[in-house]
């Protein structure tokens, strides 16, 4: 049986799975084939359980398709593949890394075999300002399809800091939970190791600290502080744009931390390569570990967020009321929580029960603004402008991909962002049947799973239409 069997499986899995999933769960696996058994070694129990639950059938199916009745048995273990004298025994991934996956860079120093916790310089260290908010944990982070991968990656980093996903780069629009996950990772690391030096900050704080260090002739103390942390969590890294001196210092800090296996987590409102005003060498390093998008929450997640928030406030929120709010406010978690706080405050002040009619009254200006902003007409104009076509093309019978794909995108957005029925949406797109609209919605949902470009287009348009 060929020792390239696992490489064949990897190649097929890379074609079949979204790039981020492949990078996060499949790429870290090591494989060893012996005695008709294929042993897969996962870096930790979390990855092992996830792969076994989610991808066991996929892998077994591939083994059967390649080997037929001679397919090897699968065995999962936590750890690394035993080292042997035979070079061919190394059955590791050589599949080319896709755009959003972890990549090995020639410039990066080989990781130390010691844990990042052991590499921290001793004595004469400054007092660390953790700034981690203890209220933001994984337990109170509402998971949904839109943020599932981001949460899973953050959870794994908290369990194994300085490991495979270093740096971890989370990106997405405002109010989607990036900061919550940063704090959750910090809390997770400190729960496992209470004396860990975990520092959370906004990128502007890093800039301010550096400026102050330069003014006070204390740049060496600044370097020692930031390069001796166990985990550095920086929010809104895009604010480094056009700050050349800060970028220079962060570049060297970044390298020092990675060489010491100390964890870095960064967030931004956009994909690393799209951050203007940041040096290419930094943007390249941002993608060395794992880059994961957080999407605007889908309807079910928005409802779950509202119900959990109400429960935290000891408020009974009827399901139909949560659905009513979630259906109308779609842009981000912060907007949802703000609306619910407003409803709760009004209910407390008036002593009235929280019903749909009460919510309509309490949020009337917000709902009116939302309905005014997002109309099918507005969606069509925005999509046409985004794809550089005419609105008339969206309404036409043309079927070329350059028109059909934007038309499907516009239909999917109309279903997501308005309260119109499928027949009403079809009528607005040149009198099309409701089944055409349904097909368009399903097609875009499928493409968002398979294509980074489509996922980005959808997120960008949602953000534009909801802002």
Curated annotation (Swiss-Prot):
Its main location: cytoplasm. SUPFAM superfamilies: P-loop containing nucleoside triphosphate hydrolases, TrpR-like. Residues 1-90 are annotated as: Domain I, interacts with DnaA modulators. Residues 131-347 are annotated as: Domain III, AAA+ region. Residues 348-467 are annotated as: Domain IV, binds dsDNA. ATP binds at residues 175, 177-179. Keywords: ATP-binding, Cytoplasm, DNA replication, DNA-binding, Lipid-binding, Nucleotide-binding. It comes from the Bacteria. GO terms for biological process: DNA replication initiation; regulation of DNA replication. It holds the Pfam family Bac_DnaA_C. One of its GO terms (molecular function) is ATP hydrolysis activity. It is found in: Cytoplasm. GO terms for cellular component: cytoplasm; plasma membrane. HAMAP family: DnaA_bact (MF_00377). Oligomerizes as a right-handed, spiral filament on DNA at oriC. Plays an essential role in the initiation and regulation of chromosomal replication. ATP-DnaA binds to the origin of replication (oriC) to initiate formation of the DNA replication initiation complex once per cell cycle. Binds the DnaA box (a 9 base pair repeat at the origin) and separates the double-stranded (ds)DNA. Forms a right-handed helical filament on oriC DNA; dsDNA binds to the exterior of the filament while single-stranded (ss)DNA is stabiized in the filament's interior. Domain I is involved in oligomerization and binding regulators, domain II is flexibile and of varying length in different bacteria, domain III forms the AAA+ region, while domain IV binds dsDNA. Belongs to the DnaA family. This is Chromosomal replication initiator protein DnaA. It comes from Shigella dysenteriae serotype 1 (strain Sd197). The gene is dnaA.
């Amino acid at each position: 049986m060929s020792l390239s069997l696992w490489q064949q499986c990897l190649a097929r899995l890379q074609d079949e799975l979204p790039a981020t999933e492949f990078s996060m769960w499949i790429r870290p696996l090591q494989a060893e084939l012996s005695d008709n058994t294929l042993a897969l070694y996962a870096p930790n129990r979390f990855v092992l359980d996830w792969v076994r639950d989610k991808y066991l059938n996929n892998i077994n199916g591939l083994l059967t398709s390649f080997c037929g009745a001679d397919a090897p048995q699968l065995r999962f273990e936590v750890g690394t593949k035993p080292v042997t004298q035979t070079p061919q025994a190394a059955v590791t991934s050589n599949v080319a890394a896709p755009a959003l996956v972890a990549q090995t860079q020639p410039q990066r120093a080989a990781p130390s075999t010691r844990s990042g916790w052991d590499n921290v310089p001793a004595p004469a260290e400054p007092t660390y300002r953790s700034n981690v908010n203890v209220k933001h944990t994984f337990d109170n982070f509402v998971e949904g399809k839109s943020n599932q991968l981001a949460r899973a990656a953050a959870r794994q980093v908290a369990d194994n800091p300085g490991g495979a996903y270093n740096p971890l780069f989370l990106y997405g629009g405002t109010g989607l939970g990036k900061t919550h996950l940063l704090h959750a990772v910090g809390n997770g690391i400190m729960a496992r190791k209470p004396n860990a030096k975990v520092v959370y900050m906004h990128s502007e704080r890093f800039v301010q600290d550096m400026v102050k260090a330069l003014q006070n002739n204390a740049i060496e103390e600044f370097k020692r502080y930031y390069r001796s942390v166990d985990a550095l969590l920086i929010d809104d890294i895009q604010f480094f744009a056009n700050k050349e001196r800060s970028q220079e210092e962060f570049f060297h800090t970044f390298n020092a931390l990675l060489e010491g296996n100390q964890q870095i987590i960064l967030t931004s409102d956009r994909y690393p390569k799209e951050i203007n005003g940041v040096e290419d060498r930094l943007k390249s390093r941002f993608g060395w570990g794992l880059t994961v998008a957080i999407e605007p929450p889908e309807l079910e997640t928005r409802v779950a967020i509202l119900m959990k928030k109400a429960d935290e406030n000891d408020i009974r929120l009827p399901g139909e009321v949560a659905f009513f709010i979630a259906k109308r406010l779609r842009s981000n978690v912060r907007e949802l929580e703000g609306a619910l706080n407003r409803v709760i405050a009004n209910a407390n002040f008036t002593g009235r029960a929280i019903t749909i009619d009460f919510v309509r009254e309490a949020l009337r200006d917000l709902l009116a603004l939302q309905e005014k902003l997002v109309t099918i007409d507005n969606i069509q104009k925005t999509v046409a402008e985004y794809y550089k076509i005419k609105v008339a093309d969206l309404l036409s019978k043309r079927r070329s991909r350059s028109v059909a794909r934007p038309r499907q995108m516009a239909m999917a957005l109309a279903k997501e962002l308005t309260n119109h029925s499928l027949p009403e949406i079809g009528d607005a797109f040149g009198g099309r049947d409701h089944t055409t609209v349904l097909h368009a919605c399903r097609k875009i949902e499928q493409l968002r799973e398979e294509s980074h470009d489509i996922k980005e287009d959808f997120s960008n348009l949602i953000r534009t239409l909801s802002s």
